[in-house]
Amino acid sequence: MSSRKRLLRWAGGIMIVLGAGHLSLLALAAWEDIAGWAERGMWAAVPLALTDGGAVQTAESLQNKVTFWAGPGSFAVPLILLGCLTWHLAGRGVAVPAGIGWALATWCVLGGVLLVPSPFFAGIISGALIILAARKEDRSRAARDPGDGPAVIRARRRR
């Protein structure tokens, strides 16, 4: 297995574990709310309240919204999907763009700073691994075509 593939597989695995762990912990911590959705129907998770804005929200409705936005409405599901996509692309030998790694790392730094302590900081590792894998792709491409310098490689990317 190439080192680029290994880096991307680790990045994807970390993202999948973080997202699945987030959803699992939420299921353990807020099982009553989630079971209530099943009893009342999924539309009851975050009901649409068509009022003039003067309605007072109950503690139960606020807890429902918090549970929804901390679970299925959070970034855990897209993080799992991104992890699966990264894993799949690594298996096919397709490089994930470094911009994805930079965006993921930036998002995790911001989330980790705003919500300390949290596992957000573990997501920085995934972002860094994606960036490293993209750089290995650039270096291997330059090694295959020694007449092309970094400027030519960047120009090819823009096409």
Where are these regions (language model features)?
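Short, intrinsically disordered terminal tails adjacent to the first/last structured region
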Residues: 1, 141-159
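Membrane-water interface of alpha-helical transmembrane segments
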Residues: 2-12, 62-65, 69, 94-101
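Juxtamembrane membrane-water interface segments that cap and precede transmembrane helices
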Residues: 49-66
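Membrane-interface capping segments at transmembrane-helix boundaries
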Residues: 91-92, 135-145
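Hydrophobic alpha-helical transmembrane segments of integral membrane proteins
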Residues: 90-130
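N-terminal signal-anchor transmembrane alpha helix
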Residues: 7-36
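Juxtamembrane non-transmembrane "cap" segments at the membrane-aqueous interface
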Residues: 33-46
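Mid-chain, well-packed structural core segment of small domains
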Residues: 66-98
